[in-house]
Amino acid sequence: MSASYSASWRRGNPRLLLLLVCTIWSTTGLLVQAKVHYHKWDISYKFKSPDCFKKLAVTINGQTPGPTINAQQGDTIVVRVKNSLLTENVAIHWHGIRQIGTPWFDGTEGVTQCPIVAGDTFVYRFVVDRPGTYLYHAHYGMQRSAGLYGLIRVAVPDGVVEPFAYDYDRSIILNDWWHNSTYEQATGLASIPFVWVGEPQSLLINGRGKFNCSLAGPTAVCNATNPECSPYVLTVVPGKTYRLRIASITSLSALNFEIEGHNMTVVEADGHYVKPFVIKNLNIYSGETYSVLFTADRDPSRNYWLAMNVISRKPGTPTGTAVLNYYPNHPRKSPPTSPPVGPPWDDAAYRFNQSHAIRSHPDYVHPPPLTSDRMIILLNTQNRVDGYTRWSLNNVSFNMPHTPYLIALKENLRHVFDQRPAPETYDYRNYDIHSVPENHNATTGTSIYRLDFNSTVDVILQNANMIEANKSETHPWHLHGHDFWVLGYGSGKFDPEVHPKEYNLVDPIMKNTVPLHYYGWTAIRFRADNPGAWAFHCHIESHFFMGMGIVFEEGVDRVGELPTSIMGCGDSKSLRGP
């Protein structure tokens, strides 16, 4: 037995981990010699100038973005996290990693673990069971927007051939960036009167952007020549084909990405192979990852722009740029053109069409069950709760209990959260999604959705008008612990008697994050086959902070003994022992 298997055997559920290893073996046809990858991270605040404006950022070993985790399918990742933030807790979510057999290491504070308190050390240990492109990021308060994030790249096992060819593999991570601290942002969101976070000051590519220092206040430190904010440079060799992994970790912005003058072929989405299609611009929403192929086949005497622009909300942020450097041109040689500005930000049809185009690769289709056992319809609305502005689902705004759900469920702490069922639907026959709600008021709740283990569940996300007239927002929804089939998108109101007949049950893509377009609906289907408690929420940082999320429970009785390291908060203090 290899070191990774024996170590995983000690920390996780032996039967599930053995099943996972056997599954990897059977699906690849190869004996996977898994490895253990050890990482030692120190989480601390450092002064950083990613867009030339100096501010405090949450860093990993002094850097933001954090280090990229590279592994092969079946490997074990061990991350020793020391919280050196002094006055803040922390938790890290491994976005897109299903945590089969290790639900306690999902890294979701309040759902699967207590936070890592200041000065403490916590060890995450999990298997990366599928190849693809994934993320990690803070999952405590609004720390993600402060810089705690990075990439996870999982390669196929040696000898396995992917359904596309390329010469080199590169990665970029896209982000939006504010100069106000997360404390200032969170305080405004939780205040009366409500203070919105506003549009980001900059867009970052691999942690680099450019703020106009002439706009900085008199007490600000902003240096346009700081090397920390020099543009990221992607160097290419003429004639070669590149796989570019693109991940979005934005806290607010939906983005449109393009490589000036080059076509891109989409081949992967959230770790699943896509039926290839060619685009000039890629729409990418927070929490999504894609792989695209492009060939360096343009005029080699010049450099080109990598550019991203805000879509789906009126932009207040300049174009984010990096440089595509054709070797042997100097990497700092500026392109002779202006950066592309992308398609119109409010072209909803364009965004719908690209969402519809993402389908499973013909050789890698995993057909969904033809029917579901349960349908949950979630109306997304903005509301007031005791005068505070909140986001709600079926008129309930989510509140996180002090004791994590996984611990409460496993240890039968029934008083920790509301045991009444969460609302399954709303009055879809009479509710007008295009109008301001007649009643702005909602309630807060801690109820969860209890799913029969191994059942098939449909979730319909329904968008609607906000409190402000003629306004609806795009929401990227992320499901922890699972991939789901994307059965369809539509504009207007979902009708459960009509629209299921239009589902794509032939070749739907599987993803872990999906957009809900404004005044529209998105239908997903998943199997409740991963024992644990799993968050499902809008990936816009401020929206989840304001209550836009739910929790699914499935098969908790099948979860192994919980490690005491995840305990220590709320009613779990007594379970941890001396």
Regions from the PLM with identified roles:
Residues 11-31:
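Cleavable N-terminal signal peptides of Sec/SRP-targeted secreted and luminal proteins
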Residues 30-33, 147-174, 319-352, 503, ...:
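Extracytoplasmic/periplasmic copper-protein system
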Residues 24, 29-49, 181-187, 191-200, ...:
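A eukaryote-biased signal for short, well-structured alpha-helical docking elements
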Residues 9-13, 66, 161-169, 231:
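Membrane-interfacial loop-to-helix junctions in multi-pass inner-membrane proteins
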Residues 1-9:
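N-terminal secretory signal peptides that target proteins for export/translocation
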